[in-house]
């Protein structure tokens, strides 16, 4: 059944029907479409816009359709134009002429926006829940590796000694921001558009606030033209997902590097690795590589929607139907990526001794030698030059800083004493950095406490979302 006709004298071409159809992808919103329709028709009855007995009969029919679809007894007809027309035609088949009153006072324009917002509200809660699961994994990893020394890098060159906990907690901060962004995005999603009609509301005395309350929205939208033209909520969601995927991708890149034979910082579990069809020795980090690759896909989904919307006049245009495939793909890709990534890092093995050995080379404690001289009264810029010359000497002699004798140290400055050896011990280098945000155990404990509190507070916020 088509939801339009009358003024047409010819049948629409079959190719146009296929081109125009959205049932193949918007059918996933059948629950939201039915729930929205139940709220709408309940309001129609209570406001005496249609007879109350008709309202109850329609609502009962919609519940029956919902139950049968959930149970798999009723199958969605893919020849329908969209999920809205399928639900309405099925309703009329079930209950008769009263079903034709369902669409009183609304348009597909405000209906589809309602469905999408309801769907997104539910999906965002699922996404936040999965990011919190990932944060719990990072919390455990960091708690177990407060003293696991590793080299920190800049420009992919060894820079200063840090701990694995410090490194892991850097990513936890990124994911905290992702959760905060999604919660903020949810606030703007929480505006109910139904009642906006095609563009100029309706002449029926509908009660939009009542529908909003029934559906768990905090308020109604204030301008009907904007309500049916708006896809900011979809674009903003995809923007949040793009940032989230970027963070997963950066983490994946490091997982890939760390798992190489050249690094061996970690070993991925067999259950999250794959092999080669020709090289029997291979153990490939395909999960991390796919997360890295799928990030570009989510970026593409965002660019699709931005491009669709960039030149559209008010109000609704059929171009806007192109929002859903990109939106749904971005949602599904991100959710699967988070869940799989979490499993990968939860099961990976940390090679602590190799990390520490790596941190012991590459002069990662050079900055601490300069800081030592500063504490002895040398200006930092002079100390920097002294240590630069010292490093050049070490390179020429094939020595590490730790292996220099005191007399060799004194060749560069008479400020060096026996206490230099304690100052350049890697654990000392780390523990001296007690500044908020640093790698010392005391600082890491604070970061872990903050992460634990954030997880608890976010769960509480999640439970309050309608």
UniProtKB/Swiss-Prot annotation:
The keyword Amino-acid biosynthesis applies. InterPro entries: Arg_succ_lyase_C, Argininosuccinate_lyase, Fumarase/histidase_N, Fumarate_lyase_CS, Fumarate_lyase_fam, Fumarate_lyase_N, L-Aspartase-like. It is found in: Cytoplasm. Its EC number is 4.3.2.1. GO terms for biological process: arginine biosynthetic process via ornithine; L-arginine biosynthetic process. The keyword Chaperone does not apply. One of its GO terms (molecular function) is argininosuccinate lyase activity. GO terms for cellular component: cytosol. NCBIfam families: argH. Belongs to the lyase 1 family. Argininosuccinate lyase subfamily. This is Argininosuccinate lyase.
């Amino acid at each position: 059944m088509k939801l339009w006709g009358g003024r047409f004298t010819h049948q629409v071409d079959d190719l146009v029907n296929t081109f125009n159809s959205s049932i193949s992808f918007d059918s996933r919103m059948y629950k939201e479409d039915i729930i929205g329709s139940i709220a709408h028709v309940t309001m129609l009855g209570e406001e005496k816009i249609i007879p109350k007995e008709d309202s109850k009969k329609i609502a009962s029919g919609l519940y029956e359709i919902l139950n049968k679809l959930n149970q798999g007894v009723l199958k969605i007809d893919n020849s329908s134009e969209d999920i809205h027309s399928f639900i309405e035609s099925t309703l009329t088949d079930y209950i008769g002429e009263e079903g034709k009153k369902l669409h009183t006072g609304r348009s597909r324009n405000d209906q589809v926006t309602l469905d999408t917002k309801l769907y997104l509200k539910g999906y965002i809660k699922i996404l936040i829940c999965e990011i919190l699961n990932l944060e719990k994994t990072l919390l455990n990893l960091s708690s177990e590796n407060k003293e696991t020394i590793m080299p920190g890098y800049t420009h992919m060159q060894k820079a200063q000694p840090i701990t694995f906990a410090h490194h892991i907690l850097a990513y936890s901060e990124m994911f905290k921001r992702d959760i905060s962004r999604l919660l903020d995005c949810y606030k703007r999603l929480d505006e109910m558009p139904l009642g906006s009609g095609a563009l100029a509301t309706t002449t029926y005395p509908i009660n939009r606030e009542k529908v909003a309350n029934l559906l768990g929205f905090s308020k109604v939208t204030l301008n009907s033209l904007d309500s049916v033209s708006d896809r900011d909520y979809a674009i903003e969601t995809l923007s949040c997902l793009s940032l989230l995927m970027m963070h997963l991708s950066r983490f994946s890149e490091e997982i890939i590097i760390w798992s190489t034979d050249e690094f061996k910082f970690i070993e991925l579990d067999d259950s999250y690795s794959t092999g080669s069809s020709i090289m029997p020795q291979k153990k490939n980090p395909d999960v991390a590589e796919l997360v890295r690759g799928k990030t570009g896909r989510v970026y593409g989904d965002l660019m699709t929607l931005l491009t669709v919307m960039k030149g559209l006049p008010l109000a609704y245009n059929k171009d806007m139907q192109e929002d859903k495939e990109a939106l749904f793909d971005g949602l599904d890709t991100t959710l699967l990526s988070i869940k799989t990534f979490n499993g990968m890092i939860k099961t990976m093995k940390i090679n602590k001794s190799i990390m520490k050995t790596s941190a012991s080379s590459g002069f990662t404690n050079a900055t601490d030698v300069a800081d030592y001289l500063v504490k002895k009264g040398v200006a930092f810029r002079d100390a920097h030059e002294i240590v630069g010359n010292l490093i050049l000497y070490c390179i020429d002699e094939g020595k590490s800083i730790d292996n220099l004798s005191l007399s060799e140290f004194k060749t560069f400055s008479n400020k060096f004493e026996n206490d230099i050896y304690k100052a350049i011990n890697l654990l000392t280098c780390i523990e001296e950095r007690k500044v908020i945000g640093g790698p010392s155990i005391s600082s890491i404990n604070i970061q872990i406490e903050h992460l634990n509190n954030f997880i608890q507070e976010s769960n509480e916020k999640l439970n309050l979302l309608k």
